């Protein structure tokens, strides 16, 4: 029991769990458990209250429901960093902000250049933009105190801004035909959350009630349901009427659940690639190549070049205690898209089948790109932090 407790207290524990459950999914998808795995994810699950009903496959419940909880945590983290952390002052925020912008633009551009002759793949441009913060921080944690604190803060701030970019992309590009009735309910729920915030209500149950209404309304509206999670996170007050911090309390509650349950579950549900159907031609086909090169080449090129030129042009300042070689190592680690890239792939290629060819190819590209980025980033970071 003591060994289990020590494991969960490790900074790298969440990254190790993500890797384990992704590997488990690949094993399931390539053994006699193959049919069980994919059929299990395609089981329809319905929830009904009167005339209101949500009918989704188990895979969609994980991606739309459980991941909404993760995005509540993202909203809480972004708000905390904006109010009191690494994004609270212009001087602190500008360096990782510029780096994050480069890390979104260049991978998308590389993906476009590789896939532009295939219009059916055009929706996938956002896939290599993402960074899996849990996995990236897990790898950094493997090196312990050798990694300077300012470098860890840089990675965290960059990843948070990267998440904000992903939220904007989801809202603008991956929303379906809108339902005015559902959006009206969502607006009322948001008004309720804002009222609770302005009144500095500290009881999280009140936010949970309005949050569930908001999530269901957004799900039915055509806007992706995970955006409800971000809004809920932003509406949790930093201080309540008694001077306590609901924001910190809720973040403290959600962090272990997201790190050790939600994200590993998502990895297990989305990382299953059936390797038996894959050959060399498929590995080097347009979709996986565009995603993999976007992550392996585009991410470090974008993050490093934008941050480097921002310093040279006097826009930003290199944080003290950080070397450019270390910035480049972090830039490579940002190519670990993994769960976030899989999430965006699920939005980009929505055919409703967990084992379709296009989903298999996109997952293959994500796994290849993320694995190479993780290995190269770890080796370079280790060599620059002796």
UniProtKB/Swiss-Prot annotation:
Membrane topology per the entry is: Multi-pass membrane protein
Q: Where in the cell is it found?
A: Cell inner membrane
- The superkingdom of the source organism is Bacteria
Residue spans crossing the bilayer: 10-30, 58-78, 94-114, 124-144, 154-174, 176-196, 199-219, 253-273, 283-303, 327-347, 361-381
Main location, first listed in the record? membrane
Keywords, A to Z, come to: Antiport, Cell inner membrane, Cell membrane, Ion transport, Membrane, Sodium, Sodium transport, Transmembrane, Transmembrane helix, Transport
Signal peptide interval = none
- Might you report a single GO cellular component term? plasma membrane
Family matches, as Pfam families: Na_H_antiport_1
Q: Name one GO molecular function term.
A: sodium:proton antiporter activity
The UniProt catalytic activity note for this protein reads: Na(+)(in) + 2 H(+)(out) = Na(+)(out) + 2 H(+)(in)
Gene Ontology biological-process entries: regulation of pH
Stored NCBIfam families: NhaA, PRK09560.1, PRK09561.1
Family affiliation: Belongs to the NhaA Na(+)/H(+) (TC 2.A.33) antiporter family.
Reported function: Na(+)/H(+) antiporter that extrudes sodium in exchange for external protons.
Xref: HAMAP family: NhaA
| Name of this chain's protein | Na(+)/H(+) antiporter NhaA
* Species, as recorded: Mannheimia succiniciproducens (strain KCTC 0769BP / MBEL55E)
Recall the taxonomic lineage recorded for the source organism: Bacteria, Pseudomonadati, Pseudomonadota, Gammaproteobacteria, Pasteurellales
């Amino acid at each position: 029991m003591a060994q289990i407790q020590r494991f969960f207290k490790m900074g790298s524990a969440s990254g190790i769990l993500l890797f384990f459950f992704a590997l488990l999914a690949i094993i399931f998808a390539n053994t006699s458990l193959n049919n069980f795995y994919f059929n299990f994810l395609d089981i329809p699950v319905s929830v009904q209250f009167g005339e209101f009903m949500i009918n989704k496959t188990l895979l969609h419940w994980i991606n739309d429901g459980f991941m909404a909880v993760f995005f509540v945590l993202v909203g809480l983290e972004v708000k905390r960093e904006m109010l009191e952390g690494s994004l609270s002052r212009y001087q602190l925020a500008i360096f990782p902000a510029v780096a994050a912008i480069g890390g979104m633009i260049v991978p998308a551009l590389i993906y476009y250049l590789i896939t532009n002759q295939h219009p059916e793949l055009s929706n996938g441009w956002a896939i290599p933009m993402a960074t899996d913060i849990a996995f990236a921080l897990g790898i950094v944690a493997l090196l312990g105190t050798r990694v300077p604190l300012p470098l860890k803060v840089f990675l965290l701030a960059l990843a948070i801004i990267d998440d904000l970019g992903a939220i904007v992309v989801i809202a603008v590009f991956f929303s379906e035909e809108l339902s005015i009735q559902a959006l009206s309910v969502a607006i009322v729920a948001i008004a309720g959350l804002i009222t609770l915030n302005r009144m500095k209500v500290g009881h999280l149950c009140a936010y949970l009630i309005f949050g569930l209404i908001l999530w269901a309304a957004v799900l039915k509206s055509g806007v992706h349901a995970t955006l409800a999670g971000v809004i809920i996170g932003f509406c949790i007050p930093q201080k309540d009427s008694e001077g306590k911090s609901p924001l910190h309390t809720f973040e403290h509650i959600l962090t272990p659940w997201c790190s050790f349950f939600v994200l590993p579950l998502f990895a297990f549900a989305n990382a299953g690639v059936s390797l038996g159907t894959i050959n060399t031609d498929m590995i080097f086909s347009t979709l996986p190549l565009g995603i993999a090169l976007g992550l392996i080449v585009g991410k470090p090129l974008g993050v490093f070049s934008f941050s480097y030129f921002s310093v040279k042009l006097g826009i930003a300042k290199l944080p003290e205690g950080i070397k450019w070689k270390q910035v480049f190592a972090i830039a490579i680690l940002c190519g670990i898209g993994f769960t976030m890239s899989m999430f965006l792939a699920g939005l980009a290629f929505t055919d409703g089948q967990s084992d379709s060819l296009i989903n298999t190819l996109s997952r293959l590209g994500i796994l290849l790109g993320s694995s190479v980025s993780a290995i190269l980033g770890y080796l370079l970071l280790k060599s620059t932090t002796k």
